[in-house]
């Protein structure tokens, strides 16, 4: 399961909110996280953490969890 490809449903299940096309947002008490995806989603994406723009490539839930853990963002539903 942890190596599942990222899909829109998975992002929504993880607490990311679908704001507009190709923009997802996840909020915690201390962080405001936006996960941007382009038309080739999920091959390329940008993670924005407290206004810091971080280009990343994330293909699986495991990779997304690992990346967010580096930035101390706890997503409880993994």
State the predicted function of each range:
Residues 7, 47-50, 74:
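Residues marking helix boundaries in flexible regions
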Residues 17-64, 68:
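Acidic, low-complexity, intrinsically disordered interaction modules
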Residues 72-78:
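Short acidic DE-rich linear segments
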Residues 1-26:
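Negatively charged, low-complexity tracts enriched in Asp/Glu with abundant Ser/Thr
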């Amino acid at each position: 399961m942890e190596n599942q490809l990222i899909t829109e449903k998975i992002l929504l299940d993880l607490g990311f909110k679908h704001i507009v096309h190709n923009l997802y947002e996840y909020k915690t008490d201390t962080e405001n996280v936006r996960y941007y995806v382009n038309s080739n989603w999920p091959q390329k994406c940008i993670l924005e953490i407290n206004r810091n723009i971080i280009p990343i490539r994330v293909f699986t839930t495991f990779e997304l969890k690992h990346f967010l853990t580096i930035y101390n963002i706890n997503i409880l539903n993994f």
